[in-house]
Amino acid sequence: MRARELRAQTLDQMKDELAKLKKEQFNLRFQKATGQLEKAARVRQVRRDIARVKTFLRQKIKESKV
């Protein structure tokens, strides 16, 4: 997910994206625990995407309060 794409999204879209990423992260952790994980790098990528979405979400909330 690119920063440019996140800036263009609304708060609701970001919240939906965050929920989707958290669900994917849960599934990846489950796959890792059961030994079925094929792409280990995806865990890191999803974790960073979650951080990125949270950062932009926080910025949007802060901007709307000002």
Curated annotation (Swiss-Prot):
CDD domains to which the protein is assigned, alphabetical:
Ribosomal_L29_HIP
GO process annotations (BP):
translation
Query: Protein name, please?
Result: Large ribosomal subunit protein uL29
In which family does this protein belong, per the annotation?
Belongs to the universal ribosomal protein uL29 family.
Instruction: Spell out the GO cellular component terms annotated for this protein, sorted alphabetically and separated by semicolons.
Output: cytosolic large ribosomal subunit
**Organism this protein belongs to:** Bartonella quintana (strain Toulouse)
UniProt xrefs under SUPFAM superfamilies:
Ribosomal protein L29 (L29p)
Instruction: Tell me which InterPro entries the record gives.
Output: Ribosomal_protein_uL29, Ribosomal_uL29, Ribosomal_uL29_sf
Pfam families attached here? Ribosomal_L29 (PF00831)
Which terms does the record give in the GO molecular function aspect? structural constituent of ribosome
Q: Which UniProt keywords apply?
A: Ribonucleoprotein, Ribosomal protein
